Curated annotation (Swiss-Prot):
Gene Ontology biological process terms from the UniProt entry: methylation; tRNA wobble uridine modification
Pfam families: DAO, Methyltransf_30
Annotated Gene Ontology cellular component terms: cytoplasm
EC number assigned by the record: 2.1.1.61, 1.5.-.-
Keywords for this protein: Cytoplasm, FAD, Flavoprotein, Methyltransferase, Multifunctional enzyme, Oxidoreductase, S-adenosyl-L-methionine, Transferase, tRNA processing
Cofactors, names only: FAD
HAMAP family the UniProt entry points to: MnmC
Location of this chain's protein in the cell: Cytoplasm
Catalyzed reaction equations: 5-aminomethyl-2-thiouridine(34) in tRNA + S-adenosyl-L-methionine = 5-methylaminomethyl-2-thiouridine(34) in tRNA + S-adenosyl-L-homocysteine + H(+)
Source organism per UniProt: Pseudomonas putida (strain ATCC 700007 / DSM 6899 / JCM 31910 / BCRC 17059 / LMG 24140 / F1)
Name used for this protein in its record: tRNA 5-methylaminomethyl-2-thiouridine biosynthesis bifunctional protein MnmC
Superkingdom of origin: Bacteria
Role, per record: Catalyzes the last two steps in the biosynthesis of 5-methylaminomethyl-2-thiouridine (mnm(5)s(2)U) at the wobble position (U34) in tRNA. Catalyzes the FAD-dependent demodification of cmnm(5)s(2)U34 to nm(5)s(2)U34, followed by the transfer of a methyl group from S-adenosyl-L-methionine to nm(5)s(2)U34, to form mnm(5)s(2)U34.
Family indicated by similarity: In the N-terminal section; belongs to the methyltransferase superfamily. tRNA (mnm(5)s(2)U34)-methyltransferase family.
Length: 654
């Protein structure tokens, strides 16, 4: 996956229109742009009629090639507002190779003051837009935008979705020949179904013939303005072949839209919020007296991207998750609940410096860039042992605030002091039991209690492990207030929040005791010395009594491959029997449906990356539950799938 971001290179003509240097063409006609969009994309696909006939909670999925300035999205959203049921939903998926930066986007959308109700929410969330899948949520979850940042022929093959309406846009074939190819049309067909419709400006003969070959029935129709003719069509080809059954979509749960979420930390609150935004009534069962009492309860967590220069599944998820979390944080109070103060990772040895150099060469400077020591000290506000890698969009978060914000949806009910010990499936409903007491029941359950998901028999074989971590709370001093960014080496220290710095965090693979220890406080103070002797002196660490220090310990929960475990759960024994042939030939794809435990899902294993991966994993769970486009590339979603471990056991003969 390419990781370098190329923003659109734009010139502005004397009429205020953006002109693309890449394609030597304007994005839209200055006087007729909106009317052209309404005629070609909204009118020819009969979108108003489609929206008007949407049932409550039903979702229309629009796919687009070429997001550009977002005009088509804004017009579709406006039409949706005008015609759709208040409980219906719109999911808009668009590919863009050269996204506009924030300044250019803001300048472009000012040309349409009549669309301000739709352009302003995008501008508010238009942050951390990096290569890959980037998801946005608007109108309380009624509208979802998934931007695929990159080349259309690299991004669309990774999309797992079923598109209802195609806006085949992008610059004209003569200006953008690399996009208009049979490979593109094959992807449109793969993602379509009988009844999918398509609109496009182009009437080029070979484009029409290629679309027909791909399975679309196309026709020319009267155009608008200077465009005499345009094209519309419908998909009449065959359904695509099924994917491997162990990664196939479970049947969408029918009946009442009610769900249980077990656990009210980051994973649980994110799962609950994503379902509630889709019209589900969610009951969250939490064993403690309040949400965010375990690993999600630390005073400050670091929004830090530990990436690979090689585009691994984990790196792709981190890029997508980071953007999604940053957009969610815009709703919280900066300074109290979070701060985009940046994160500086020190190059503490030669190996780390080499790693940072490779990352800086692989990613956009707006995401990360190397700093020399003097530059790093100027940003951090304290003396440092060297330079490092700076993430300007990173920062710190108060995790309980994010959990509470997600749980405030009116469709969510949190019930505390509910320690679920057992699940039973009775009459298409899952029942949550504590001994002989029935706590709650619903057709859908999401297990989000970190390593505690192992207590439930369907998850017992998941290879989750707990790692104890302890943070230390240090009272801020007048001179320690100078720290202006999170600084990391082997540990991390954050700028003060409510008069305290958070310092951490230890890693203990053996202890099961959650009482903070003096030894680990001392270990954290040693980590602070490695980060900045100057800051340690400003905090008067030498005068602190480790036995009097405050802190907290919790368990991180992680998987062997460091990816979270997110998705539907299958019956482990039936799974092993159904696909036993893989033990003899891993290339086999048996034509046997996966034995799903209908309505049961998991969201766990986020390790120390929960702030980045858990919120987007809530969206991933909701997409599995509701049959919506996945918010991650298909291969990344599969890399997070619970079935990956059962497959590995079969293939390795264990």
């Amino acid at each position: 996956m390419p990781t370098l971001l190329q923003h659109a290179q734009i010139d502005w003509d004397d009429q205020g229109r953006p002109h693309s240097r890449h394609y030597d063409d304007v994005y839209f006609a200055v006087n007729e742009g909106i009317e052209e969009t309404k005629h070609v994309f909204l009118g020819q696909t009969r979108l108003a009629e489609r929206f008007a006939h949407l049932a409550p909670h039903a979702c229309t999925v629009i796919g687009e090639t070429g997001f550009g300035t977002g005009m088509n999205f804004f017009c579709a959203w406006q039409l949706f507002d005008q015609h759709a049921h208040s409980d219906a939903r719109l999911h808009f998926v668009s590919v863009e190779k050269y996204p506009l930066d924030h300044a250019d986007m803001a300048r472009a959308v000012r040309l349409w003051p009549e669309l301000a109700a739709y352009t302003e929410p995008l501008l508010e969330q238009y942050v951390a837009v990096h290569p890959g899948f980037q998801q946005f949520t608007f109108a309380g979850g009624r509208v979802t935008l998934t931007l695929l940042i990159g080349d259309v022929l690299e991004q669309l093959p990774q999309l797992d979705a079923q598109i209802d309406v195609w806006f085949l846009d992008g610059f004209a074939p003569a200006k953008n020949p690399d996009m208009w190819t049979p490979e593109l049309f094959a992807q449109l067909a793969r993602l379509s179904h009988p009844g999918t419709v398509l609109g496009t400006f182009t009437t080029t003969g070979w484009v029409r013939r290629s679309l027909v070959e791909a399975g679309f029935a196309m026709k020319k129709v009267p155009g608008i303005g200077k465009k005499w003719e345009v094209m519309s069509g419908a998909y009449v080809g065959p359904l695509p072949g099924p994917c491997a059954p162990w990664y196939a979509r479970p049947a969408v749960t029918q009946g009442p839209r009610e769900a249980l979420v077990i656990g009210a930390g980051l994973a649980g609150s994110s799962s609950a919020a994503s379902l509630a935004r889709r019209g589900w009534q969610v009951t969250v069962l939490e064993r403690h007296e309040a949400p965010a009492q375990e690993a999600s309860g630390n005073p400050q967590g670091v929004l830090y991207l530990k990436l690979s220069a090689h585009g691994t599944a984990l790196s792709q998820m981190i890029l997508s998750g980071f953007g999604y979390t940053r957009r969610q944080l815009q709703r919280l109070q900066r300074g109290r609940d979070w701060d985009a103060c940046g994160v500086l990772q020190l190059a503490f040895d030669s190996k780390e410096a080499e790693r940072q150099g490779k990352l800086a060469a692989a990613f956009d400077p707006g995401l990360l860039h190397c700093l020399a020591r003097a530059e790093a000290e100027a940003i951090a506000g304290v003396a440092l042992p060297g330079g490092g890698l700076f993430y300007p969009e990173g920062g710190w978060v108060h995790p309980p605030a994010l959990c509470q914000q997600q749980l405030q949806h009116p469709g969510i009910r949190v019930v505390t002091h509910q320690d679920v010990l057992e699940l039973r499936k009775v009459d298409e409903h899952w029942q949550a039991w504590a001994g002989d007491q029935l706590l709650a029941r619903a057709p859908v359950v999401v297990l989000a209690g970190a390593a505690d998901v192992l207590r439930f028999e369907p998850c017992a074989q998941l290879p989750l492990k707990r790692i104890r971590g302890q943070i230390t709370r240090l009272p801020a001093t007048a001179s320690s207030q100078a720290l202006r960014t999170v600084v990391c080496a082997e540990g991390y220290v954050a700028p003060p929040r409510e008069g305290e710095h958070t310092l951490g965090a230890s890693f203990d693979f053996h202890s099961e005791d959650l009482a903070p220890t003096v030894a680990e406080h001392q270990g954290n103070l040693a980590l602070l010395d490695e980060i900045s002797v100057d800051l340690a002196q400003r905090l008067a660490v030498a005068e602190l009594d480790p036995e009097q220090l405050q802190g907290r310990a919790a368990f991180r929960c992680t998987s062997p491959d460091y990816l979270p475990i997110v998705g539907p759960i299958a019956d482990a024994q039936a799974f092993a029997e159904a696909y036993a042939v893989l033990g003899r030939d891993a290339r086999q794809v048996p034509d046997v449906p996966c034995p799903w435990l209908g309505g049961l899902y998991v969201n766990s294993g986020h390790g120390s990356r929960g702030l980045i991966t858990a919120p987007l994993s809530g969206e991933l769970v909701a997409a599995w539950v509701c049959g919506e486009p996945l918010p991650l590339p298909r291969a990344v979603a599969q890399a997070c799938h619970p079935n990956r471990f059962g497959l590995r056991r079969l293939i390795r003969g264990k």
